[in-house]
Curated annotation (Swiss-Prot):
SUPFAM superfamilies tied to this protein: Glucocorticoid receptor-like (DNA-binding domain), P-loop containing nucleoside triphosphate hydrolases
InterPro entries noted in UniProt: AAA+_ATPase, ATP-dep_Clp_protease_ClpX, ATPase_AAA_core, Clp_ATPase_C, Clp_protease_ATP-bd_su_ClpX, ClpX_bact, P-loop_NTPase, Znf_CppX_C4
Protein name: ATP-dependent Clp protease ATP-binding subunit ClpX
Chain sites annotated for binding ATP: P121, T122, G123, S124, G125, K126, T127, L128
Subunit structure: Component of the ClpX-ClpP complex. Forms a hexameric ring that, in the presence of ATP, binds to fourteen ClpP subunits assembled into a disk-like structure with a central cavity, resembling the structure of eukaryotic proteasomes.
Keywords: ATP-binding, Chaperone, Metal-binding, Nucleotide-binding, Zinc
Organism from which the protein derives: Aromatoleum aromaticum (strain DSM 19018 / LMG 30748 / EbN1)
Record-listed Zn(2+) binding positions: C14, C17, C36, C39
This protein's record includes keyword ATP-binding: yes
């Protein structure tokens, strides 16, 4: 668009907003059209917003995976624990199916939430299962340690801090946070000290259970904005926890004794049947767990009632630990091989060495969690020296490297022969 000035010079205008060339910083000419810098900036903003919306739409699952699909994906990352994975797959599927069913309608039958309790030894995969589920469903996920929680007003973390972390994880998007997953680890550590109500204050045991009750069941939590501290005359962010899935996990050391006391009746007298209490391992005992055992262990009845889905995980044997080392997508052996390949070196860990790593983890009673530290200590020296070693083509780790601390075998590239003058 153009006009003629008094001196005959043409005055140019933006074809979109109508501003003259003197009102804008830059006017760009096209075939019979002009566009100013302000309109270009506005177009960029519109396109950027549309791209972001498209990415969000593609990133969010439009179809909910079936329990079988959930279980198959869990199999790629977690070895063994078949029954626990089936329990989790069904519980998570039903939870998110319930949320889709609830959206925007009022139904005659109200579907209640089924939170989950994972019981299993250290290093059996409780945390990994919860993390993998959240990644699969593309929902916000946060972990909390129950041992750091105290009742409101005491030194320690308030239970509402868990929801604050979840809100921070999804950039203060309230709607996303209200459909997230919270994993509370070490839940067995907040059991009350005895199964009888105490007259003394137990701010990190029964007190925390009482504080968690409403949060897990569903309440509106008031969260200070941007992670600040609560103070009067402050606007709070309201988060409804009704649709947040809570998964609690713990090792529950000593629970097997409670279960055996209930299941194995020891008779007295000459005609009594004598049963050995050593026949069952911890995993077999956990499979028989009942709500009354958890109450006897130290969880209050109301808290047990809010965790209706109980999944037990088994102790990992030597073969399962070896599978964990080599099979999953993010297997430890694959990770170390990748690190060595960045130095241009192949890493071979022989089968005998894998068995030695698994046996060591079993002796330490650390389960899968201890595998990395064993491999790290065995490979530390060679990883320290490798960047300065020349000609190394392959590093071989055998049983002696794991059990006795021997140095790995180094294989060098064959040097090319240079013909010398006679």
């Amino acid at each position: 668009m153009t006009d003629k000035k008094a001196g005959g010079e043409k005055l140019l205008y933006c074809s979109f907003c109508g501003k003259s060339q003197h009102e804008v910083r830059k006017l760009i000419a096209g075939p019979s059209v002009f566009i100013c810098d302000e309109c270009i900036e506005l177009c960029n903003d519109i396109i950027r917003d549309e791209i972001a919306e498209t990415v969000d739409a593609e990133g969010t699952r439009t179809t909910l995976p079936t329990p079988q699909e959930i279980c198959e994906i869990l199999n790629q990352y977690v070895i063994g624990q078949t029954q626990a994975k089936r329990n989790l797959s069904v519980a998570v599927y039903n939870h998110y199916k319930r949320l889709r069913h609830l959206s925007g309608r009022k139904e005659e039958v109200e579907l209640s939430k089924s939170n989950i309790l994972l019981i299993g030894p250290t290093g059996s995969g409780k945390t990994l299962l919860a993390q993998t589920l959240a990644r699969l469903l593309n929902v916000p996920f946060v972990m909390a340690d129950a041992t750091t929680l105290t009742e409101a007003g005491y030194v320690g973390e308030d239970v509402e801090n868990i929801i604050q972390k979840l809100l921070q994880k999804c950039d203060y998007d309230v709607d996303k946070a209200q459909h997230g997953i919270v994993y509370i680890d070490e839940i067995d550590k907040i059991s009350r000290k005895s199964d009888n109500p105490s007259i003394t204050r137990d701010v990190s045991g029964e007190g925390v259970q009482q504080a968690l009750l409403k949060l897990i069941e569903g309440t509106v939590a008031s969260i200070p904005p941007q992670g600040g501290r609560k103070h009067p005359n402050q606007d709070f962010i309201q988060i409804d926890t009704t649709n947040i899935l809570f998964i609690c996990g713990g090792a529950f050391d000593g629970l097997e004794k409670v279960i055996r006391n209930r299941t194995e009746k020891i008779g007295i007298g000459f005609g009594a049947e004598i049963k050995s209490r050593e026949g069952k391992n911890v995993s077999e005992s956990f499979r028989q767990v009942e709500p009354e055992d958890l109450i006897k262990f130290g969880l209050i009845p109301e808290f047990v009632g809010r965790l209706p889905v109980v999944a037990t995980l088994q102790e990992l044997d030597e073969e399962a630990l070896i599978q964990i080392l080599v099979e999953p997508k993010n297997a430890l052996v694959k990770q170390y091989q990748k690190l060595f390949s960045m130095e241009g070196v192949d890493l071979e860990i022989r089968p005998a060495a894998l068995h030695a790593v698994a046996r060591k983890a079993i002796r330490r009673k650390t389960g899968a969690r201890g595998l990395r530290s064993i491999l790290e200590s065995a490979l530390l020296d060679i990883m320290y020296d490798l960047p300065t070693l020349e000609g190394v083509e392959k590093v071989v780790v055998d049983e002696g490297t794991i059990e006795e601390g021997a140095q790995p075998l180094l294989m060098y590239a064959e040097q090319p022969k240079v013909s010398g003058s006679n």
